[in-house]
Amino acid sequence: MIGVCQLHLRIPESHSLKEKRHILRKVIDRVRHRFNVSVSEVGDNDLWQRSQIGICTVGNDRRFVNSSLDKIIDFIEKMYLADVIEKEIEIITF
């Protein structure tokens, strides 16, 4: 199973692209180190108060993969650095 999640974030404390990248780096690094998943900014690169990040994880159980993505989303929301305004989750079976 491959779990893919795309999050649309609003970053209210950002007033420039430099501040946005600084905040995103914190979010991405903390998620990557805590959950051992792949994370990257995948959209809205030139908007200073919005971003899209992609998260990918793999596992052999659908419930585990889905639960992992839910925990990551909850973790990001509880950091209070960015607001999750939209989320898309897809579980791919191969």
Residues covered by each model-derived region:
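A structural boundary/capping signal
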Residues: 8-10, 36, 74
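A generic structural motif
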Residues: 11-16, 59-61
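Short glycine-/aliphatic-rich beta-strand segments at the starts of folded cytosolic domains
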Residues: 3-13
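C-terminal structural segments of small proteins and small subunits
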Residues: 58-94
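Hydrophobic alpha-helical membrane-association signature
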Residues: 23-27, 68
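Short, charge-patterned binding micro-sites
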Residues: 2, 40-61, 90-94
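C-terminal binding/interaction regions
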Residues: 20
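Amphipathic alpha-helical assembly/interaction segments
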Residues: 30-43, 66
